[in-house]
Amino acid sequence: MIRINQIKKSYGTHENRALILKGISTEIEDGDFVVILGASGSGKSTLLNVISGLEQPDSGSVTYDGTDITAFNDRELTAFRRENVGFIFQQYYLLPNLTVEKNVRMGADLAGNSDYRSVLKAVGLENKLKKYPGELSGGEQQRVAVARALAKRPRVLFLDEPTGALDEATGRQVLDYISRLQEEYRFTVVMVTHNLNIAEMANTVI
């Protein structure tokens, strides 16, 4: 279980500091599909970054089964993210000089997992292994990003507007892949979106 307790986060200089997260508390059960819903600038991505360990809060705690990651130093946070979480963002961040297979294998290698081909097959890319990112459509590139994140078998998958750069039909297809893979691999999903239709996929909305 992930417990978020009285998280506060602010940005800016001392004179012009803006409080973005104002004492947020919630719990996320293992295997939950959680959506952080809100308008642009409401602090959705900031909350995701704090929960995932990409940013530290000003105060409060984030615990994974009782372990408070806000007490970790940078080295410990890096190790925690490598071992426990996967990330998918609106931008794909694929390495253009590597094939689909090698991009995905990078995620598997981080976790010492050799079974990355099953994830490639699950997202319908088994026939694109030798293609390069520049040869793929936007939807296919995002599926590569999904496969790379899941190849390491993360405990929690964090997604920040993962379909924002895709048309509605392609975005829905990518989300369907994620939903099916979650059922198969039983990981927790925490996704940021402003889209009410996407939020309907979740069993918990923050």
Task: For the regions a language model picked out, list residue spans one by one.
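ABC family nucleotide-binding domain
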Residues: 2-205
